[in-house]
Amino acid sequence: MPTITANNCEMHYEIDDYTDPWLKDKDTIWLQHGVGRSSKFWYHWIPAVARNYRVLRRDMRGHGLSADPGPNYTWSIDELLNDMRGFLDALGLDRVHYLGESIGGILGVAFAAKWPERLKSLTICSSPTAIRPSARTALSGGDRELGRELERLGGGGWVKILIEQKVISGKNPAHVEWVTNEWSKTPTHVLRGINRMLANADISPLLPQVKVPTLVLAPSRSPLTSLSDQLIIRNSIPNARMAVVEGPGHEIYVDEPEECISAFMKFLKMLP
């Protein structure tokens, strides 16, 4: 289980590479998970993607096997961006194709606006620009205060609300059990801290500043980001492309992996 220290944080990561062993010039794809998840959640993408690319998966700070910054840590977009840049620097990677899901996409937009020279392309999947009132309702399961609900339920209890609200996929009982167990591993103070950070975040002003080739994987029925919001993202990023994915909820990369992977791979092959 490889780890590397960047920006004063020990980060766990995985590299999957099933390309032909004699190839010397290999592009790297970075798959970044969302809140409460870990690098494990991309398991079903690896067979299709790692045959042609080196695939990098990183546990975000406080998630999976990466270090927990503790309950007094002040979460900020800037520090998470510094984590990302430090991670690339520590691995000696100059440029990657970046795909971020949900908050991973939010961070991807901000990273691309700040350090475009580090990305060959940007793909954002099911990513809002900001947490709207309707999204807050879905995240809390009603009109309840999210912080109190998280403190009361913990990650494992919260995930049940998210499945009911179609924020998280619940494909079958075995999948629900696995997802619940994985979410339970994320400390409650991490979930609360990130949600406080996102409550006031809005990356809309950064969209026109993104100058790297961009694909928007847009869910048609996400309770966290409407299709009209996804269109705004596509229209605000210069020359961005969009693929609308008809799924039951927010997690299209889980519910419709074949369609998402197909659109993603087609996008990469179109790049110069």
Task: Enumerate the predicted regions with their spans.
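Conserved acidic catalytic loop of the alpha/beta-hydrolase fold
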Residues: 78-96
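Gly/Ala-rich beta-loop-alpha elbow adjacent to hydrolase catalytic centers
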Residues: 100, 104, 108
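Flexible "cap/lid" loop of the alpha/beta hydrolase fold
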Residues: 109, 113-114, 119-152
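Conserved alpha/beta-hydrolase catalytic His-Asp/Glu region
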Residues: 133-139, 151-208
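Short beta-strand/loop motif that positions the catalytic acidic residue
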Residues: 210, 216-218
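Acidic catalytic loop of the alpha/beta-hydrolase fold
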Residues: 221-225
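Catalytic active-site module of serine/aspartate enzymes centered on a nucleophile-bearing elbow/loop
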Residues: 240-272
